């Protein structure tokens, strides 16, 4: 029987989570976190209106972390895909990264959609109408192909256009379910697509995966300074959360005419783009993916852009990025994706 969001008695998303203390004021900038071991006792807590509340709240490690670690013990590499701003093509890039890794028949790939309130991965992967099946051992991912599986809240909606209007604890509970109860099996790569910004979903994924280890994050941006501004915040978040940064990708970097293959600069980099930012921040620049209208078409139809349009310069750029991500994780480029 497929799990449903309308069956809270069967799937209690909040049950595994410890109750967060009810604060009387917003958390200050350097707050250690109301559920941390230092809550209410750290130097930064002095003078905070929440100090007594946090100090008396129950503390301790999450008892489900060992279960998550055991479930993911057969996953070799875990990659987070992040973006500071929405609309830069992060989820689109996540699908192409997944298709790129799975183009190697010797690799098995999982794609987890943690954008709980805006799940678009199933549509892009062509499995929007599928549902999750449960077994005695957990939830089965929806398999796009023999070596590419997907998990998303979209599969659990009674109607595909239903809005998911959840606060943080319930979203965190579902993300924990995705990591603890999904039968990912033996994966070479688990790609985690996240919502824009640095919100509850990012904090939850990082805390749940810290024990099992994350290889790193791939940051996606466009050339404009308004996008780079938020990517700088994402870089700061990764460093504060001790998430390794595999590199940055500049998406929509130029426009490729599907007819003549000529590339034009539509979104010009006003301040040097992602390449300059990567140099300033001393992080790897993974590559620039040009804007090809057929990428959007492939996502609308749930097709692999890499398979449908192998002659596109964007396809070559994506394949190169896939190899570079593998190299940043210590793999050989040809081992990740052999040259055609």
Curated annotation (Swiss-Prot):
Heterotetramer of 2 NBP35 and 2 CFD1 chains. It is found in: Cytoplasm. This is Cytosolic Fe-S cluster assembly factor NBP35. GO terms for cellular component: cytosol. Keywords: 4Fe-4S, ATP-binding, Cytoplasm, Iron, Iron-sulfur, Metal-binding, Nucleotide-binding. InterPro entries: Mrp-like_CS, Mrp/NBP35_ATP-bd, NUBP1/Nbp35, P-loop_NTPase, YlxH/NBP35. Belongs to the Mrp/NBP35 ATP-binding proteins family. NUBP1/NBP35 subfamily. [4Fe-4S] cluster 2 binds at residues 257, 260. [4Fe-4S] cluster 1 binds at residues 31, 45, 48, 54. CDD domains: Mrp_NBP35. The keyword Iron-sulfur applies. The keyword Cytoplasm applies. GO terms for molecular function: 4 iron, 4 sulfur cluster binding; ATP binding; ATP-dependent FeS chaperone activity; iron-sulfur cluster binding; metal ion binding. ATP binds at residues 84-91. One of its GO terms (biological process) is iron-sulfur cluster assembly.
């Amino acid at each position: 029987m497929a799990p449903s969001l309308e069956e809270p008695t069967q799937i209690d998303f909040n049950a595994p989570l410890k109750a967060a203390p009810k604060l009387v004021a917003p958390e200050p900038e350097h707050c250690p976190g109301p559920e941390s071991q230092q809550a209410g006792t750290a130097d930064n807590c002095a003078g905070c209106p929440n100090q007594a509340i946090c100090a008396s709240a129950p503390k301790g490690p999450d008892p489900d972390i060992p279960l998550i670690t055991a479930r993911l013990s057969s996953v070799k590499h875990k990659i987070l895909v992040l973006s500071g701003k929405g609309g830069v093509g992060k989820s689109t890039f996540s699908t192409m990264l997944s298709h790129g890794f799975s183009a190697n028949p010797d690799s098995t790939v999982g794609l987890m959609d943690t954008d709980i309130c805006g799940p678009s991965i199933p549509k892009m992967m062509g499995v929007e109408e599928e549902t999750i099946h449960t077994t005695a051992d957990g939830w089965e991912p929806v398999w796009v192909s023999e070596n590419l599986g997907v998990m998303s809240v979209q599969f659990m909606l009674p109607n595909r256009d239903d809005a998911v209007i959840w606060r943080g604890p319930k979203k965190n509970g579902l993300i924990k379910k995705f990591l603890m109860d999904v039968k990912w099996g033996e994966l070479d790569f688990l790609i985690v697509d996240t919502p824009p910004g640095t919100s509850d979903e990012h904090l939850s994924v990082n805390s749940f995966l810290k024990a099992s280890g994350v290889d790193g994050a791939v940051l996606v941006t466009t050339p404009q300074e308004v996008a780079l501004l938020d990517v700088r915040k994402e870089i700061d978040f990764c460093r504060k959360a001790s998430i390794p940064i595999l590199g940055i990708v500049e998406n929509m970097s130029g426009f490729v005419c599907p007819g003549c293959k000529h590339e034009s600069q539509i979104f010009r980099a006003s301040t040097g783009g992602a390449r300059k930012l990567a140099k300033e921040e001393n992080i790897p620049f993974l590559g620039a993916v040009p804007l090809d209208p057929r990428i959007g078409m492939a996502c609308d139809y749930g097709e692999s852009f890499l398979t449908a349009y192998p002659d596109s310069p964007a396809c070559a750029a994506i394949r190169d990025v896939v190899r570079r991500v593998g190299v940043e994780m210590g793999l050989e480029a040809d081992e990740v994706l052999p040259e055609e």
